[in-house]
């Protein structure tokens, strides 16, 4: 099968490239510290299993294309409770954070656009941005500076006529850097 030129540009995630080596080391009895793919460590609520056990609808239909109303209402209510009101039209439910981010980036980035991202960053950001035709303009950080990137001069030096967005997480992934309130306001 011939793959698209866009997907050929993406390459493998570094985590996926190194996984076979880690697996081989584990087989040899080596002690590994997994700092790669995050797995949930919070117990699944019992109510979930109870609901699945008691589910008896004979046909599993597709969800409404605009989302399950009860789920959307729950999101709207949650944000209302934390004093960040939103409307149902502002909610899009996805199966995961990566999917949500890929959709959002596809909506705002075009060929030739740039997105500013502090590095090191979550490796899949490269794939998501490459698929849009945009490029990443990194803000380089160092361990000596605790991976701080929210420095006005550094951020402004990256902004140009092609900049469409700045992408960061708080805490940072993979560095764990936590922005102060002042740094968040700057960003």
Which residues fall in each region the model found?
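N-terminal small-domain helix-loop-helix segment of the aminotransferase-like
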Residues: 6-96, 103, 154
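Structural signature of beta-strand start/N-cap positions in the alpha/beta core
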Residues: 114, 135, 164-165
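Short beta->alpha connector loops at strand-helix junctions that form conserved
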Residues: 119, 138-143
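A short helix-loop-beta submotif of the ANL/AMP-binding
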Residues: 131-137
């Amino acid at each position: 099968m011939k793959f698209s030129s866009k997907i050929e540009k993406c390459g493998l995630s570094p985590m996926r490239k190194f996984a076979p080596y880690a697996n081989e080391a584990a087989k040899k009895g080596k002690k590994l510290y997994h700092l790669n793919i995050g797995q949930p460590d919070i117990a699944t609520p019992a109510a979930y299993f109870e609901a699945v056990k008691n589910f008896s609808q004979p046909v599993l239909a597709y969800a409404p294309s605009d989302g399950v109303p009860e789920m959307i209402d729950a999101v709207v209510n949650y944000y209302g409770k934390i004093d960040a009101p939103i409307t149902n039209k502002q909610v899009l439910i996805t199966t995961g954070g990566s999917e949500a981010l890929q959709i959002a980036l596809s909506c705002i980035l075009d060929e030739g656009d740039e997105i500013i991202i502090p590095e090191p960053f979550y490796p899949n950001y490269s794939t998501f941005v490459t698929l849009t035709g945009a490029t990443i303009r990194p803000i380089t950080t160092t361990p000596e500076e605790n991976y701080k990137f929210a420095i006005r001069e550094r951020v402004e030096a990256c902004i140009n006529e092609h900049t469409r967005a700045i992408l960061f997480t708080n805490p940072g992934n993979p560095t764990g850097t936590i922005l102060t309130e002042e740094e968040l306001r700057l960003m």
